[in-house]
């Protein structure tokens, strides 16, 4: 099982690459839309990448509750058990 730090590292890398932001901006507290400039299409792309990378399914209802990088890490961590 991946540790929280390993999950965060992979999530950070994916977000940095997809959104074209420096990895130093991608903190657990960073808001995907407000701080990192993601839009709804970016979120869909990111979710597909997370699902592929971690082998988890992100439910649409759960996606609405995710606003920060830390939310994503916690969600994936929970899904991986």
UniProtKB/Swiss-Prot annotation:
One of its GO terms (biological process) is lipid A biosynthetic process. Signal peptide: none annotated. GO terms for molecular function: acyl binding; acyl carrier activity. PROSITE patterns: CARRIER, PHOSPHOPANTETHEINE. The modification O-(pantetheine 4'-phosphoryl)serine is found at residue 40. Residues 5-80 form the Carrier domain. It is found in: Cytoplasm. Keywords: Cytoplasm, Fatty acid biosynthesis, Fatty acid metabolism, Lipid biosynthesis, Lipid metabolism, Phosphopantetheine, Phosphoprotein. Its main location: cytoplasm. Gene3D superfamilies: ACP-like (1.10.1200.10). 4'-phosphopantetheine is transferred from CoA to a specific serine of apo-ACP by AcpS. This modification is essential for activity because fatty acids are bound in thioester linkage to the sulfhydryl of the prosthetic group. One of its GO terms (cellular component) is cytosol. Pathway: Lipid metabolism; fatty acid biosynthesis. SUPFAM superfamilies: ACP-like. It comes from the Bacteria. InterPro entries: ACP, ACP-like_sf, PP-bd_ACP, Ppantetheine_attach_site. Belongs to the acyl carrier protein (ACP) family. Carrier of the growing fatty acid chain in fatty acid biosynthesis. This is Acyl carrier protein. The gene is acpP.
């Amino acid at each position: 099982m991946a540790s929280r730090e390993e999950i965060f590292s992979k999530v950070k890398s994916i977000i940095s690459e997809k959104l074209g932001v420096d990895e130093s901006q991608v903190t657990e507290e960073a808001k995907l839309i407000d701080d990192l400039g993601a839009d709804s299409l970016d979120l869909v792309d990111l979710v597909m990448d997370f699902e592929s990378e971690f082998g988890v399914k992100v439910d649409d209802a759960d996606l609405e509750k995710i606003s920060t990088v830390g939310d994503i890490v916690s969600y994936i961590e929970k899904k991986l058990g």
